């Protein structure tokens, strides 16, 4: 019985070690947004985010291009002031874009979900949920 208990203990320790190590955010990888908080994106809209290794974030906000500085340390991520180009689109796309840009400014930490989705979390509420593009 002792060898079994020792094997079980070692196996459990290995699993805990694996579970505690989060997958990293990939720099210079484009991510495609699927949800803004509690709402999915409008059909056929394409919102993206790339986190450059130089500390600059950028992408497509659905209508306009967006950009911001960001700081990443462990599971904490914060964005500086978010800017964008100023093209006009359909009102529903403009509203979605504003929700996205406001949500980016409220992000405080990140994680990778059990289904390998990048989630950017505000202090309160539901996350922005992204898939790796391509």
Identify the meaning behind each predicted range.
Residues 7, 18-134:
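Lipid interaction determinants
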Residues 1-16:
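Sec-dependent bacterial lipoprotein signal peptides
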């Amino acid at each position: 019985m002792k060898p079994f208990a020792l094997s079980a203990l070692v196996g459990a320790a290995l699993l805990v070690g694996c579970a505690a190590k989060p997958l990293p955010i990939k720099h210079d990888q484009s991510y495609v947004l699927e949800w803004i908080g509690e709402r999915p994106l409008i059909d056929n809209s394409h919102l993206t985010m790339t986190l450059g290794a130089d500390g600059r974030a950028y992408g497509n906000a659905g209508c306009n291009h967006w950009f911001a500085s960001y700081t990443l340390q462990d599971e904490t991520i914060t964005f500086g002031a978010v800017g964008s180009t100023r093209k006009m689109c359909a009102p529903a796309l403009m509203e979605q874009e504003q929700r996205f840009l406001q949500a980016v400014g409220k992000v405080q930490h990140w994680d990778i979900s059990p289904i390998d989705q990048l989630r950017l979390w505000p202090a309160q509420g539901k996350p922005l949920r992204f898939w790796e593009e391509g």
